[in-house]
Amino acid sequence: MKIWVDADACPGPVRDIILRAGQRVKVHTVFVANHALSLPRLAYVSSVQVGAGLDVADRHIAQQAQPGDLAVTQDIPLAALLVPKGVVVLDPRGEVFTEENVAERLSVRNFMQELRESGVTTGGPDGYSAQDRQQFAGALDRELTRLVKTEPK
């Protein structure tokens, strides 16, 4: 099992929570970005710097992630690729993408993108709050605990 982090737009507090959790459960954590990352030198932590370009990090994660892995991303199209592969996907606010909700989330995302492209101002997400951090930490802990228990020995 690995934790895959779409690090290009990962909030700092989320990165810190992931680092601590990965060390606690001794799971290899891979941060993927199209720029150099400054990460602490820790056991179980690595980074992959992919080439520049749209969705290059996403494609790397989609190709490398395996069933039973966990991924953290706010990129809904990436989540839509990972969930059917059996990868547990969390967003930075602690929402778990599932077979039941990922198609709807992708449809809403595409609709909002069409609105923006046609000139409609749609606004952005709320700022990242302490409550978001708590929800993410709780969801990450629950999913990691479940995955570690079900991982073949």
From Swiss-Prot:
Output the Pfam families linked to this UniProt entry.
DUF188 (PF02639)
InterPro entries for this protein: UPF0178 (IPR003791)
CDD domains from the UniProt entry: PIN_YqxD-like (cd18720)
What domain of life does the native source organism fall in?
A: Bacteria
- Give coiled-coil spans as residue ranges: none
Q: Show the NCBIfam families listed in the entry.
A: PRK00124.1 (NF001095)
Task: Give the record's family classification.
Answer: Belongs to the UPF0178 family.
User: What is the protein's given name?
Assistant: UPF0178 protein MXAN_5526
Could you tell me which species this protein originates from?
Answer: Myxococcus xanthus (strain DK1622)
